[in-house]
Regions:
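Acidic, glycine-rich loop-and-strand cores that form catalytic or ligand-binding grooves
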Residues: 410-426, 431
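Extended alpha-helical scaffolds used as interaction platforms
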Residues: 7, 13-15, 30-32, 47-49, ...
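Small/polar residue-rich beta-strand/coil "junction" motifs that cap repeat-based extracellular fibers
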Residues: 220, 254, 334-410, 415
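Conserved SAM-binding site of S-adenosyl-L-methionine-dependent methyltransferases, i.e.
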Residues: 2-4, 9, 19-21, 26, ...
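C-terminal accessory segments
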Residues: 403-417, 439-451
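C-terminal intramolecular chaperone/auto-processing assembly modules
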Residues: 459-503
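Active-site and glycan-interaction determinants of carbohydrate-active enzymes
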Residues: 445-464
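Glycine-rich, low-complexity segments
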Residues: 5, 22, 294, 382-406, ...
């Protein structure tokens, strides 16, 4: 029965039971196998090899179907190449398709310009067009999605109507269903993405758990791996933002930068391990390796420099600039530290301003600030002098003061303290820290404390290991002493005048 009804069809080769049976005018066809090209009538330039290959083709031309049931239901589609058992099985009028592999594109009906390579690749595609699926089960659930490129074992396996996607790598974009305009490259990249769109995930498991998050850019192995609904994020580097779930508008650049961020938003972490432990802290900017490493919920911080603010956990509104600046700060807030290791030892101190290398740090001279607040420290214990072009001006408006009485000290107080000539030394070694031959004039804080008593004002014992005094507070005492001396002088003048009258 091969070519049984052929009338004027020329240059045909029909081999096998019922092959080309109903061909009438079709020309230059090659049908090999039982029922191959069975229903072909006017279709020409076709090559059908295999049992029932192209069995239902009627008018389709320039097709190549190789394998059992390959192109079985094709009727009028043209320029198709189906190779493999069941490849293009349900294709009807779809044209310009290339399906290679067992059941590749088996349910395609009218979809055109598709390329499916691999076992069951694009097997459920119906009307989707301009797709390229390469790898076993790649895009196997795609139905109407178009302009997709899936490369790798099970890449884009669950995609149904999602379009304009590029998935490359084993199981890349595996669960994507309707997500559009995504680019996933790497094994399991964007594995759980379903409807998330406009994402770019590059690297093994990059964006692995992303579901509906959109407009994300993750580059690096495990970058943004746990992101689910977070959007508008940029993560670059191994494990960068890997634990982020719903946090959005973040930029993490560097190995493990912002790794533990979950819901924090609007953060910028640049440098390996920068913001590593941040979870919900938001509006932070950490620049430098390990900057803000242990920050968890602290927000509105700016750390720039290697390990700057590394130990900060919940401290907020801090600005640390310099190598290890604010290194030990944990919950201290509203601080500004600028300089190499500035404020290094501060832990809970708040509202401090430290300027200069090692400012607020040291075992001698300037205090080693840890928990103190509301301090302004400029420089360190090695600075020999402070210079300014004009005098300091302090607020002294009576309207801003609550008066508690007059200064109780005067000449008697001054007589009990002794000015000393000195130079600073390292308390531990006894070595001078001042320039050799340079001396200073001042007082002993211990001596002034002893004279002031229980409620000191001029001297401070807030830190028993770093006694301090405010020399300006001696000015009112000097004024009182001058007044006392002036009164005594006036009394003496009156007495002298009285004695002169008597004489």
């Amino acid at each position: 029965c091969a070519g049984l009804y052929n009338t004027i069809g020329n240059y045909n080769n029909f081999f096998g039971t019922a092959s080309g049976r109903f061909n009438t005018t079709g020309c230059r066809n090659n049908f090999f196998g039982p029922s191959a090209g069975l229903c072909n009538t006017t279709g020409s330039y076709n090559n059908f090899f295999g049992s029932c290959a192209g069995c239902n083709n009627i008018t389709g031309s320039s097709n190549n179907f190789i394998g059992q049931d390959a192109g079985l239901c094709a009727t009028g589609g043209n320029w198709n190449n189906f190779i493999g058992s069941g490849a293009g099985l349900c294709n009807t009028t779809g044209s310009l398709n290339n399906f290679f592999g067992l059941s590749a594109g088996s349910r395609n009906t009218t979809g055109s310009n598709n390329n499916f390579f691999g076992n069951s690749a694009g097997s459920n595609n119906t009307t989707g067009s301009y797709n390229t699926f390469i790898g076993a089960y790649a895009g196997s659930s795609n139905t109407t999605g178009s302009y997709n490129t899936f490369i790798g074992l099970r890449a884009g396996l669950c995609n149904t109507t999602g379009s304009n996607n590029f998935f490359a790598g084993r199981c890349a974009g595996y669960n994507n269903t309707t997500g559009n305009y995504n680019f996933f490259a790497g094994a399991c990249a964007g594995f759980y993405n379903t409807t998330g769109s406009h994402n770019t995930f590059i690297g093994a498991c990059a964006g692995y758990k992303n579901t509906t998050g959109s407009n994300n850019f993750f580059v690096g192995c495990y970058a943004g791996a746990c992101n689910t609904t977070g959007s508008h994020n940029n993560f670059f580097g191994l494990g960068a933002g890997s634990c982020n779930t719903t946090g959005s508008n973040n930029t993490f650049i560097g190995s493990n930068a912002g790794r533990n961020n979950t819901i924090g938003i609007a953060n910028n972490f640049i440098g390996a391990y920068a913001g590593f432990c941040n979870t919900s802290g938001s509006n932070n900017n950490f620049f430098g390796p390990s900057a803000g490493t242990y920050n968890t919920t602290g927000s509105n911080n700016f750390f720039a420099g290697f390990c700057a603010g590394a130990c900060n956990t919940t401290g907020c509104h801090n600005t640390f600039i310099g190598f290890c600046a604010g290194y030990r700060n944990t919950i201290g807030s509203n601080n500004f530290f600028a300089g190499f290791c500035a404020g290094f030892c501060n832990t809970t101190g708040t509202n401090n301003l430290f300027f200069g290398c090692n400012s607020g740090v040291g075992t001698f001279g300037l205090a080693n600030i840890t928990t103190e607040s509301n301090r302004i420290i400029m420089g360190n214990c090695l600075h020999a002098c402070a210079q300014i072009q004009v005098a300091w001006t302090a607020v002294s408006d009576i309207r801003d003061k609550c008066i508690f009485g007059s200064v109780p000290h005067g000449r008697g107080f001054l007589q009990k303290i002794n000015p000393v000539k000195f130079a600073f030394k390292d308390r531990n070694t006894g070595c001078l820290t001042d320039i050799v031959g340079k001396y200073r004039y001042g007082f002993s804080a211990q001596e002034i404390l002893a004279v002031e008593g229980d409620k000191p004002v001029i001297a401070s014992n807030e830190d028993p290991d770093k006694l301090q005094l405010t020399s300006d507070y001696l000015v009112p005492v000097l004024v009182n002493a001058i007044k006392e001396l002036s009164a005594e002088l006036d009394a003496l003048k009156e007495r002298v005048a009285s004695l002169e009258l008597k004489s």
